[in-house]
UniProtKB/Swiss-Prot annotation:
Efficient DNA binding requires dimerization with another bHLH protein. Binds DNA as a heterodimer with MAX. Residues 229-238 have a biased composition (Basic and acidic residues). GO terms for cellular component: nucleus. Residues 205-226 have a biased composition (Acidic residues). Glycans are attached at T58. This is Transcriptional regulator Myc-1. Gene3D superfamilies: Helix-loop-helix DNA-binding domain. Residues 369-390 are annotated as: Leucine-zipper. Transcription factor that binds DNA in a non-specific manner, yet also specifically recognizes the core sequence 5'-CAC[GA]TG-3'. Activates the transcription of growth-related genes. Residues 310-362 form the bHLH domain. Keywords: Activator, DNA-binding, Glycoprotein, Nucleus, Transcription, Transcription regulation.
């Protein structure tokens, strides 16, 4: 907002209610203008007509809470206000300059003598053109900082166009800043929106020509920016298209893996039904799995997900086979131990303990039998030797 933005860097804590009324109804204000004009020259014949246009701008919005503006930003704001001819002089100038502005020849003679006003306007416009061309050259070297300030100053100018001020047709000389930001060309200029109530025809013609030249230059700059934005959108679209092309084969491969997993689920039921032919069926299933894997390698490229699933399935098959073989070995061991041979519900720990005891007892029996065998062999040797002695004696 131009009013609040111009006041923000001066005082943050001013009250909203302290703003004066926006129409002059008192006689004190009329005396003030009358007194100011009386110091320089007699009142002009247009004084009564001019009283009808004594209006302040529309009321400002809430006080701004922005940070304090630097000197460069203040100069940018003043140059923007001068470029749009919208902001009232009392909000951007001090008290001394406001008095000199009231004494200006443009105000005194704007209704009747158009020659002096036209000369004054041409002088101001020529100075403003020179400053704008110098500022645009500096803007080309520092485009990044100007883009940040452009959005801020664009909001200021758009909200400024909503204010109605009779002083918009009276430009006044102020120190121009070294910078000037561009405004969107799609928005019409404020001077064209508010008709010049008290300016001469020559002054309005010069202002309109000046604004047309500025609009053409700003349109060229905006066209360059539009080209950049179109290229960025095309890059984003290309990246989006390239991202959307890749995940489709992964989904197809995952569906293929899920169907292949379903084929493995049929084998365990046959294993439990007929344990005698488990190894034969496991070998046949492993051969069929290897054939399926070879066919898939030939038809489609393997991905990391499919390889992990194949490894997982192979591990599950081998683990199931190992458990079945272990169970069969426990059953065979249980049948060999007399203590638990008839106990079908014997636990694996009980089977192992009984098997250990049975082994120890069998080892003792073996040693005892070996000692008996040795005794019998010696006895047989003695008997053979005695038999030979008896034969030799006869």
């Amino acid at each position: 907002m131009p009013v609040s933005a111009s006041l923000a860097y001066k005082n943050y804590d001013y009250d909203y209610d302290s703003i004066q009324p926006y129409f002059y109804f008192d006689n004190d204000d009329e005396d003030f203008y009358h007194h100011q004009q009386g110091q320089t020259q007699p009142p002009a014949p247009s004084e009564d007509i001019w009283k009808k246009f004594e209006l302040l701008p529309t009321p400002p919005l809430s006080p701004s809470r922005r940070q304090s503006l630097s000197t460069a930003e203040q100069l940018e704001m003043v140059s923007e206000f001068l470029g749009d001819d919208v902001v009232n002089q009392s909000f951007i100038c001090d008290a001394d300059y406001s008095q000199s502005f009231i004494k200006s020849i443009i105000i005194q003679d704007c209704m009747w003598s158009g020659f002096s006003a036209a000369a004054k306007l041409e002088k101001v416009v020529s100075e403003r053109l020179a400053s704008l061309h110098a500022a645009r050259k500096e803007l080309m070297s520092d485009s990044s900082s100007n883009r940040l300030n452009a959005s801020y100053l664009q909001d200021v100018s758009t909200s400024a166009s909503e204010c109605i001020d009779p002083s918009v047709v009276f430009p006044y000389p102020l120190p121009e800043s070294g910078k000037s930001s561009k405004v969107a060309p799609s928005e019409p200029m404020p001077v064209l929106d508010t008709p010049p109530n008290s300016s001469s025809s020559s002054g309005s013609d010069s202002e309109e020509e000046e604004e047309e030249e500025e609009e053409e230059e700003e349109e060229e700059e905006e066209e360059e920016i539009d080209v950049v934005t179109v290229e960025k959108r095309q890059k984003k679209n290309e990246t989006a298209v390239s991202d959307s092309r890749y995940p489709s084969p992964l989904v197809l491969k995952r569906c293929h893996v899920s169907t292949h997993q379903h084929n493995y689920a049929a084998h365990p039921s046959t294993r439990h039904d007929q344990p005698a032919v488990k190894r034969l069926r496991l070998e046949a299933s492993s051969n069929s799995n290897s054939r399926h894997v070879k066919q898939r390698k030939c038809t489609s490229p393997r991905t990391s997900d499919s390889e992990d699933n194949d490894k997982r399935r192979t591990h599950n098959v081998l683990e199931r086979q190992r458990r079945n073989e272990l169970k069969l070995s426990f059953f065979a061991l249980r049948d060999e131990i007399p203590d638990v041979a008839n106990n079908e519900k014997a636990a694996k720990v009980v089977i192992l303990k009984k098997a250990t005891e049975c082994i120890h007892s069998m080892q003792l029996d073996e040693q005892r039998l070996l000692s008996i065998k040795e005794q019998l062999r010696r006895k047989s040797e003695q008997l053979k030797h005695r038999l030979q002695l008896l034969r030799s004696s006869h």
